[in-house]
């Protein structure tokens, strides 16, 4: 991975993330765990990793160390800063694409299996992917996150058509609505104060979405009904 990225530290972050996610999918499936339960766990893990990656990339690339040196009035060369920034971006790109792909796969599996908890969890994952893209600077990362969210949304719409074939028009209306919202977002250029307010709202919605993943995943495992029966 270091040879592919052209940077050893970036390769550690990207390759380590990919290896951890592959192991997270492979080991439970080989042990016979149901795919939808593995998807529920990996959905939470993948979204969580996406939230941690920007900070981890800065630490592993040495940017935080250089910032500390600069804060202490120690000399920092431009070459070292450029190398650290390049390492952070390369490692972040590979790791983010891997985590987004894992979250997309988890969302598709959840959307393709019956059950309200699974469908809600898939929708939350799609929303989390869209909200997470604000933290990633490169186009490849943003495109992967948006494509993943749209793919999961497509899976949910297909589930709708499969379960209720007589309401196919609802799927068409929902798809047109998504396209209309996307075009409006691309065309509208709000003033700076509206952007700042929008970021605050998005931060709160993202926090609520991520927090909701865990109790909904508990429902996928069927533990909510057991807890209700117990108490």
Segments the model singles out, each with a brief description of its role:
Residues 153-194:
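C-terminal hydrophobic structural anchor segments
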Residues 192-211:
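Interfacial loop-to-transmembrane junctions
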């Amino acid at each position: 991975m270091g040879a592919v990225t052209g940077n050893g530290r970036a390769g550690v972050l990207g390759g380590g993330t990919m290896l951890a996610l592959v192991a997270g999918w492979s080991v439970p499936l080989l042990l016979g765990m149901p795919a939808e339960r593995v998807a529920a766990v990996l959905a939470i893990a993948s979204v969580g990793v996406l939230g941690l990656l920007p900070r981890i990339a800065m630490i592993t690339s040495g940017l935080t160390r250089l910032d500390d040196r600069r804060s202490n009035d120690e000399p920092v060369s431009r070459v070292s800063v450029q190398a650290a920034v390049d390492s952070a971006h390369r490692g972040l790109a590979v790791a983010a694409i891997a985590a987004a792909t894992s979250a997309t796969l988890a969302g598709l599996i959840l959307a393709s299996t019956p059950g309200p908890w699974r469908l809600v969890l898939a929708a939350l994952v799609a929303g989390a992917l869209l909200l997470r893209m604000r933290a990633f600077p490169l186009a490849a990362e943003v495109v992967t996150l948006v494509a993943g969210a749209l793919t999961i949304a497509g899976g949910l719409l297909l589930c709708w058509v499969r379960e209720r074939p007589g309401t196919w028009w609802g799927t068409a209306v929902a798809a047109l609505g998504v396209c209309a919202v996307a075009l409006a977002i691309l065309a509208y250029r709000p003033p700076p104060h509206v952007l700042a307010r929008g970021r605050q709202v998005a931060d709160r919605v993202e926090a609520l979405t991520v927090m909701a993943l865990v109790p909904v995943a508990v429902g996928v495992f069927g533990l909510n009904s057991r807890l209700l029966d117990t108490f």
